[in-house]
Amino acid sequence: MMKKTLISVILLLAIVFSTHAQQHCFFTHYSTEDGLSQNTVMNILQDHKDNLWFATWDGINRFNGYTFKTYKARQGNYISLTNNRVDRIYEDRYGFLWLLTYDNRVHRFDPKTETFEQVPAAGEEGSAFNVHTIEVMPNGTVWLLTENDGAIRILTHPNENHRLTWDIYSSKTELFPSLHVFKVYQDKAGNDWLLTDNGLGMIHPGKKEPDSYFTETKGKFGGMNQAFYAVQDRKS
């Protein structure tokens, strides 16, 4: 009886404190009148310094808790932002921001220098691919998943001024037997798993060539329809 009473009291106190806390909640509405560059916000990110970043239809906005600062392409500014309409924003382990714009292009933003760069660089192979998803891995690797051209793996080299290199995983480049990668997952060992419409691929840390699984090939790269959409790294 004492145990039941104690549980009841704890639950009652939890309800009271929860109700009490709700009474002190408040909301602040921010708009272009407060410095936001555009009222249509597509995505919000909190970075490792607790700044809030807003992806809008007119560039990205940084909010430090007091004021907004806008970063976008302006006429006469030689910065590599192909479109001011930003749909998604992510942060990697090095503090760089990765942006997916309305024209399906990807840009890396450096908050320190406040500059953009298109990735892959304009004119390079893969720069015209239509990217629909950015996957940021815990180890700093960034994957760009395209509509019909496979996936692009972006590597950052911190000891070389954070220089970028990339590889295209696609049946067109003969590096990977698929054009459609649905998801990339990094397991506890640092292996990158690619879930595709044609089986699974796995890339070991520090390696370029993938291992393919569950793919029955008819020809060199033509395969059966074995699509994978989810993966789980179970505890041993």
How would you label these PLM feature ranges?
Residues 1-236:
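Carboxylate-rich, polar loop motifs that coordinate divalent cations or form catalytic acidic clusters
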